[in-house]
Amino acid sequence: MAIVIVATLVPVPEHRDAVIAALETAQGKAHAAEDGTLLYALHEGRDGRLVMIEKFADDAALAAHSAGGALAELVAALDGKLSAPMDVQVLTPHPAGLAAKGTL
């Protein structure tokens, strides 16, 4: 079963652009080098929060992502640039209705 993660980040206002750049760099590396990464999509909320929606093929793909250099580089690049700790939620789907519309 695929694993979906939502990571929410609140950048310090003066570091917003640097945080976005770091996330975009990590996004490109995940897309290019992680076969089991099915989705790694950055979005911005209307309140300025940044949300990375991630989907991994399985536990092994998530483990590879977690152990990869791109994530370590991202964590280092974000040091001191967030106003609160990153909120990471590992989600379990509860599909209803049409399967294609009820899960990520």
Locate the predicted segments by residue.
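Exposed loop/turn and edge beta-strand positions of beta-sandwich/beta-sheet ligand-binding modules
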Residues: 5, 36, 46
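Short, 15-30-residue, compositionally biased linear elements
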Residues: 20-21, 41
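Short, surface-exposed ligand-recognition loops at beta-strand->loop->(often short) alpha-helix junctions
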Residues: 10-20
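Short coil/turn motifs at secondary-structure junctions
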Residues: 12-14, 45, 57-59
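An amphipathic, aromatic/His-enriched active-site/gating alpha helix that lines ligand/cofactor pockets
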Residues: 25-39, 55-89
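Active-site-flanking beta-strand signature of metal-NTP-handling nucleotidyl enzymes
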Residues: 3-9
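Glycine-rich beta-strand-turn "strand-cap" elements at beta-sheet edges
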Residues: 2, 41-48, 74-104
